[in-house]
Amino acid sequence: KINIALLTGHLSQKEKNEIYQQLENGQIDIIIGTHALFQEKVQYNQLGLVITDEQHRFGVEQRKALKDKGNKVDFLVMTATPIPRTLAISLYGDMDVSTIKTLPNGRKKVITKFIKGTSMKPILKDLKDYLLKGGQCYVVCPLVNESEAITGRNASDISKAMAQYFKGQYEVGLVHGQMSDEEKNKIMNAFKENKIQILVSTTVIEVGVDVSNANMMVIYNAERFGLSQLHQLRGRVGRSKEQGYCYLLSEATHSEQKERL
């Protein structure tokens, strides 16, 4: 029998202590977890293999911290975010780097368009036509609420405006990091079941979301997101044989921002 356990920061201290003890005694064969796996207090009986997904979220020091917890530990690290070869060598110089350039069978490359400004008017017809065909759409904003310190469209206002505009035609949902896990799960499940056709959100959807019927994404103030975030966000669409579309709305003026987009 293979024993599998989960270690995250959400567990109670009692649950964590039980897992720590079982790991040290070799009673757990496979441990799945978050950054909690790097902690000093976590000791492994005989760590031999580490598989890291979303590697761009972890640093070199964190990888070393895990490596030091075993003897001759094998590593497999994965990321969907393209990393320039020179950067890859500096980050993973001690590892073999392989790049998969082909898409999964039947998948199409996501069509990405840059739209100058922060108005949805230039793409409104495309959005309506897409929704009319039965598709679902993500609308991503950099802020939850209006901010005096930071400029950018906020999810709360955008969701209200879209709900008013599409009233009686399509359901609009809102999800962001300030919601409880229960609230977020309720909205995400409604979106998966197509009870919500337009999901307005912040970056909480950038990982772990897979809705094959949602193949259009609109990103407001795209210049406010990093390259890895943009790749992760865009990765939410085009996850089926249907064509995916990603619209980057931006008033970017700096050359670096424009290059990134």
Regions found by a protein language model. Give the residues of each.
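Inter-lobe coupling/hinge segments of SF2-like helicase ATPases
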Residues: 1-260
